[in-house]
C-alpha cells in the first residue's frame, strides 16, 4: 500500500529507520533514548523496522517498546508514519509519497528482496 502525506506550511517531518526495538543488538535499548528525535518535528516517518514484530524470541519485548515509543510520539504531538520493513512486515504501508511524490520513502528490503527474502 502507498501512503500519502502532504505537510502544511510550518510542519516538519523527520525520517528514521531500523531502530529494531527488542533486538539484542539494537543501539537504542529503551524508547526514551530516542526522545530527542521528537523535538522540532510534527511527523516522524519510520522507514521500516521500528521493532521486532515477526515471530521471534524478541517479539514481545519489541512490541512493548514499540507501543511505548508510539505513545511518546502522541504525547509530544508528533504523528508517527510507519512503513513496513522486513522485521515489521505487518505495517500497512510499504511506500510513502510525500508532497505529491516529490519525496518517496521506503525500507531497503522493498527494493532488494534478496537481502531479506522473508520480508
Regions found by a protein language model. Give the residues of each.
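Histidine-centered catalytic micro-motifs
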Residues: 19, 105-109
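Core catalytic region of metal-dependent phosphoesterases/phosphodiesterases
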Residues: 2-101
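Active-site-proximal loop/helix segment associated with metal-binding centers of metalloenzymes
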Residues: 108-119
